[in-house]
Curated annotation (Swiss-Prot):
The keyword Lipid metabolism does not apply. Phosphorylated at Thr-344, Thr-360, Ser-362 and Ser-370 by CDK1 in prophase and metaphase and dephosphorylated during anaphase. Phosphorylation does not directly affect casein kinase 2 activity, but may contribute to its regulation by forming binding sites for interacting proteins and/or targeting it to different compartments. The keyword Chaperone does not apply. The modification Phosphothreonine is found at T344, T360. Residues 36-41 are annotated as: Interaction with beta subunit. It comes from Rattus norvegicus (Rat). The modification Phosphoserine is found at S362, S370. Can use both ATP and GTP as phosphoryl donors. Phosphorylation by casein kinase 2 has been estimated to represent up to one quarter of the eukaryotic phosphoproteome. The lineage of its organism: Eukaryota, Metazoa, Chordata, Craniata, Vertebrata. The active site is at D156. This is Casein kinase II subunit alpha. SMART domains: S_TKc.
Amino acid sequence: MSGPVPSRARVYTDVNTHRPREYWDYESHVVEWGNQDDYQLVRKLGRGKYSEVFEAINITNNEKVVVKILKPVKKKKIKREIKILENLRGGPNIITLADIVKDPVSRTPALVFEHVNNTDFKQLYQTLTDYDIRFYMYEILKALDYCHSMGIMHRDVKPHNVMIDHEHRKLRLIDWGLAEFYHPGQEYNVRVASRYFKGPELLVDYQMYDYSLDMWSLGCMLASMIFRKEPFFHGHDNYDQLVRIAKVLGTEDLYDYIDKYNIELDPRFNDILGRHSRKRWERFVHSENQHLVSPEALDFLDKLLRYDHQSRLTAREAMEHPYFYTVVKDQARMSSAGMAGGSTPVSSANMMSGISSVPTPSPLGPLAGSPVIAAANSLGIPVPAAAGAQQ
């Protein structure tokens, strides 16, 4: 065996090659720390693998913010997240990093973000119309095309990491803790993304992946929204996850994929993969979801959920798909009328301070997938008694 066949991204391949080293060399990044006394924690919003997330108040201007207190992980990983957030700041639909503070006692870093009045996705996704799905998918694509153009893969695209303020039709792509700089020919860790959204490349242990990983995850989100099946590929473990995919996309194309890249499949798959035909997308349509499905939706989905990462649409190609024609037309009309609401990043003043325009923001839904720590008061900030009570 000569090893796997190398692969390079079809777009934005050499972005980081043409940037100065300090752009992508996050290990050398010097973090500028803000003042932790500027923030008062209000209540806990959620916890994840790598962090705890709180709603807080910036007491210098009385604005709501979100504070993500990082668990003690490798300094390198924290620096990577910070550098990526700083590089992407101001980009369309990218969550804005407003400040970085550190508790002087515990030395635990905390990231301060603009506040988004989020609706929990499990409730929201059941209420979205066909147009809503197109609209929000297009908004995610703006964020993905931007980060890809900046040489960055998100690597954890999933509903929990998409904050939607439905009332204001505002969307933000959050949690850049697993994001990484793309360098052609580099082999990456396949232990990224959440199981239901892991691309086949991760499941077959192909390490030379690229931005197209995010497009698979987006395809999984689209399928779950239009078919009202959450998650769409429901594997019980990483091996079963590939089996669930093969039962839809078929085993023939899977074997073509592993042959093309000379991938050696884990012997554990021998007993569980079986032989499956490729299913037509129409078979997932029923009376409860047919109002969300159209020929262009199925065509778009088909062009995202491909085994071969090089065959998937890029974010920019996806934005040009007929599925988005109505959204593009509406946004063009609104921007010519000077009112392109949710389609553009909020003003930089608003970004730095959180969204002040919402008079009485309702509570953020739990950030269930967010990265987290045990010490509720690790910022050394007085926390109201109820702050840790609400999950």
